[in-house]
């Protein structure tokens, strides 16, 4: 499993989502983090209770995942991959780097 093939920089992540309106954006942080800031259009699915079989996600849809720094979202990505999902993208650097490189108005924590 090569994590690098699923990693996108914040700019690549944004461009990919912008070009694919059917893609799904998943935030795997906890609710208290979601309440501070989030990327518009995201669905909250905390890693602490993440189960690929009950997410309702379509294996044929491209799924963009993020967390605070990119580690938890990679764990969720690996679970989805094991469950048969193949169109998966992870935000390298997480929402923290996103706030620096894409959305400077976003609160950081």
Stretches with model-predicted labels:
Residues 1-24, 31-62, 68-109:
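Rhodanese-like catalytic fold shared by cysteine-dependent sulfurtransferases
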């Amino acid at each position: 499993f090569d994590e690098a093939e699923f990693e996108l920089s914040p700019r690549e992540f944004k461009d990919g989502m912008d070009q694919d309106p059917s893609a799904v954006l998943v935030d795997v942080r906890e609710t208290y983090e979601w309440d501070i800031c989030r990327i518009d259009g995201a669905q909250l699915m905390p890693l602490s209770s993440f189960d690929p079989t009950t997410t309702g996600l379509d294996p044929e849809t491209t799924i963009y995942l993020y967390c605070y720094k990119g580690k938890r979202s990679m764990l969720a990505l690996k679970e989805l991959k094991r469950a048969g999902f193949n169109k998966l993208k992870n935000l390298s650097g997480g929402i923290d780097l996103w706030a620096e490189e894409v959305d400077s108005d976003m609160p950081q924590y």
